[in-house]
Regions:
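N-terminal hydrophobic targeting signals that begin at the initiator methionine
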Residues: 1-2, 17
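Sec-dependent signal peptide recognition
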Residues: 2-9
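C-terminal motif of bacterial Sec signal peptides marking the signal peptidase cleavage site
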Residues: 12-15
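Immediate post-signal-peptide N-terminus of mature secreted/exported proteins
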Residues: 17-70, 147-151
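Hydrophobic alpha-helical core bundles mediating ligand binding, dimerization, or RNAP-core interactions
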Residues: 31, 35-49, 76-79, 100, ...
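Soluble, cytosolic/nucleoplasmic coiled-coil alpha-helices used as oligomeric scaffolds and tethers
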Residues: 51, 58, 89-92, 96, ...
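Long, amphipathic, charge-rich alpha-helical segments that form helical bundles/coiled-coils
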Residues: 68-131
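Short, low-complexity, Pro/Ser/Thr/Gly-rich segments in the mature regions of secreted, periplasmic
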Residues: 134-151
């Protein structure tokens, strides 16, 4: 598990240090690719979550949490691989991808630490705050790029 997270961290760091895009046209194409991929992955996630709830809605307590966490890790792993398959050179678009991936990993941590419980632990609250900061940065950067490169 720790090895997998370290691999993801290395991928994220290497993605963050990639060179600048060749031209604004390339950055616009990369932003369009990212947007399409993010939308596709979000739609897949929603479909898969409906299927998961249909199949596992009867579970409760620890069994439900363990099952949900296992499912979440599987789908996140697939989605992170797909997102990392994009060839992105533009640093701003790359930052969006990094935030997208980080949100997936932090959500897993929040689920592991009962972050979505009625009374989350201090660690879970810290993770939730990080998720909110990243979401805010993601939305702001996405809006900036959307104005810069209209779709």
């Amino acid at each position: 598990m720790k090895l997998l997270r370290m691999i993801f961290l290395v991928l994220i760091v290497s993605a963050c240090s990639s060179p600048k895009a060749d031209s604004p046209a390339t950055a616009k194409q990369e932003f369009a690719q990212f947007t399409k991929m993010a939308e596709t992955l979000d739609n897949e996630f929603m479909d898969e979550s409906r299927n998961f709830l249909t199949e596992n809605g009867h579970l409760t307590g620890d069994k439900a949490q363990k099952s949900a966490l296992k499912w979440l890790k599987e789908i996140d792993s697939k989605q992170i691989q797909k997102m990392n398959s994009l060839q992105i050179k533009d640093p701003q678009v790359n930052r969006l991808r990094t935030l997208f991936i980080q949100n997936r990993l932090d959500t897993e941590k929040a689920v592991e630490n009962d972050g979505y419980a009625k009374k989350p632990s201090a660690k879970a609250m810290e993770i939730n705050q990080k998720i909110e900061r990243n979401k805010t940065e993601y939305r702001q950067l996405f809006d900036t790029l959307k104005k810069k490169y209209p779709l």
